[in-house]
């Protein structure tokens, strides 16, 4: 994309987030990346008081179509200050979409949907996705972030999850079928 569209910024999460909001208000569709969720907390004022509420403040006349991607979860050298996943905080904010894919295929489809949405999205990306292998088509495709996916059909029990918990649910359901003959449905939010 070139230096006009992809660039590094100083390590000031609040300034970076405010700049992304301004770019969105100017007609762009910024993809803002906070590499560590824990530092994204410094930008809560911009996200909570401005980005999520802008449509309401403008009586629906103006939107902030920004996607804020942040990486969460376990990984190399993570202490307690770098291991938080506070997605539920953001799920309670009116005007803000929260996305937490459970597979590489979902990550691509939900990311493209987030970028082209006319509302702000926080995109939580689990580090566990980085080591997953799955076929992902090269051509663009979009997944509806408001729809749940049935990852596995079952008759006896439903397990509902999102993000990395879906992988855990699939593993547990496989063991339950082998050991106890319990058929599990897995629903991915």
Which residues fall in each region the model found?
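Residues at the starts of beta-strands that form the adenosine-phosphate
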Residues: 65, 156, 183
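Glycine-/acidic-rich phosphate or pyrophosphate-binding loops and their flanking alpha/beta elements
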Residues: 109-120, 129-179
